[in-house]
């Protein structure tokens, strides 16, 4: 207990020296985060041992200390990478390297030079919102090289240049839906109006366009349209952001797998509606046929009764006594009930025999119509892989090998058509870290990794969705072993595919 308290006090003294010195070097900032990491590890260990206080300092929960230690490790790795770049000699303060600055929009980027931006909605000075624009943004490209980019503001939002792409990390249209009634806003930089709202039919430029000289904060005042239409603003916001304001990307289009699933759902609903309509039509036809048969049987009964009456009158002759109503009532009820029961049994036996014949015949016809097709399909599917795969057919299949292939020859022939890959999607830094970790931990379970890349819109130059990375394999079995063994980072999803060649 005393040993832990002494070590904790030493770490506190080192932190106080750094705060008093306030050295603006990356070496001092890295040392600061190293001390914070050791402090979190010490508190974690103390909590594990049941210690709740170190002097006057209460010991937090294990999850809190673990999260702080991981945060410190991540900041140390980022600062060490920045130290190796050409920007390592620039002055860096504690504020510039704090987690609050690093996590603020644009998230997971180092930034310097905050500037206040005020946006007034509906020309009402009381209906205003404040934003922060950073003069310089530091980011890493796909080749792990650091770059320094200037930030700017226009009527659409606040952005920074990522190469030739304009990445918006604040969109005024998102807050205009909440704060504005007319869809108008004006942008002020240092209390000077930079963009005033005017009524115009020309829509504002879409995010992701090329940078021009009249949109940065250092340019003179210009007038431009910033009217928010109900449809256009929704489309612009959907095009520029997928995960809030984090990625400044357009959402990716639907994949072929999603489109195929949607088509399957439509076909299932159509087949269900058809089967329901067919069953209803069958029920109606059966009810109609029953009603017709009942009407015909009633007609036959009435005819037979009339014939019996006429034959009875003819047989009696003029001298025979007539039967009155009282005589009919005097007949025994047993004879009438037995006659009706015999009639009903005959009709049931006839209906059952006819129905049973139809059922047996229907089942027989169903088997006869079904068996040739199934046998033919089995013969065709079995005969496809009796031959080898031609050179032109290698790499042409886009489906994974199904489980119906039990032999090695069939599986090898199928895999020859399908050079497999895995496409992973997520944040660019997360994918790069995953690639570096997989190269050390899963050697031999893959062929190669690609760099992080993105799709670009066909109607613009903004990036679509999240970053992508491809992992290639020699065979499907190798891909399966890799997928079973690897643990994908949080927020990263995958999909399987193949190419003609790699």
Swiss-Prot record:
InterPro entries: E2/EBNA1_C_sf, Nucleotide-bd_a/b_plait_sf, Papillomavirus_E2_C, PPV_E2_N, Reg_prot_E2, Regulatory_protein_E2_N, Regulatory_protein_E2_N_1, Regulatory_protein_E2_N_2. Residues 195-388 are annotated as: Disordered. Keywords: Activator, DNA replication, DNA-binding, Early protein, Host nucleus, Phosphoprotein, Repressor, Transcription, Transcription regulation. Residues 243-290, 298-311, 357-367 have a biased composition (Basic residues). One of its GO terms (cellular component) is host cell nucleus. Residues 312-344 have a biased composition (Low complexity). It comes from the Viruses. GO terms for molecular function: DNA binding; DNA-binding transcription factor activity; nucleotide binding. Residues 1-201 are annotated as: Transactivation domain. The keyword Flavoprotein does not apply. GO terms for biological process: DNA replication; DNA-templated transcription; regulation of DNA replication; viral DNA genome replication. Phosphorylated. It is found in: Host nucleus. Gene3D superfamilies: 3.30.70.330, E2 (early) protein, N terminal domain, subdomain 1 (1.10.287.30), Papillomavirus E2 early protein domain (2.170.200.10). Residues 211-242 have a biased composition (Polar residues). Residues 418-502 are annotated as: DNA-binding domain. Binds DNA as homodimer. Interacts with protein E1; this interaction greatly increases E1 DNA-binding activity. Interacts with protein L1; this interaction enhances E2-dependent replication and transcription activation. Interacts with protein L2; this interaction inhibits E2 transcriptional activity but not DNA replication function E2. Interacts with protein E7; this interaction inhibits E7 oncogenic activity. Interacts with host TAF1; this interaction modulates E2-dependent transcriptional regulation. Interacts with host BRD4; this interaction mediates E2 transcriptional activation function. Plays a role in the initiation of viral DNA replication. A dimer of E2 interacts with a dimer of E1 in order to improve specificity of E1 DNA binding activity. Once the complex recognizes and binds DNA at specific sites, the E2 dimer is removed from DNA. E2 also regulates viral transcription through binding to the E2RE response element (5'-ACCNNNNNNGGT-3') present in multiple copies in the regulatory regions of the viral genome. Activates or represses transcription depending on E2RE's position with regards to proximal promoter elements including the TATA-box. HAMAP family: PPV_E2 (MF_04001). Belongs to the papillomaviridae E2 protein family. This is Regulatory protein E2. It comes from Human papillomavirus 25.
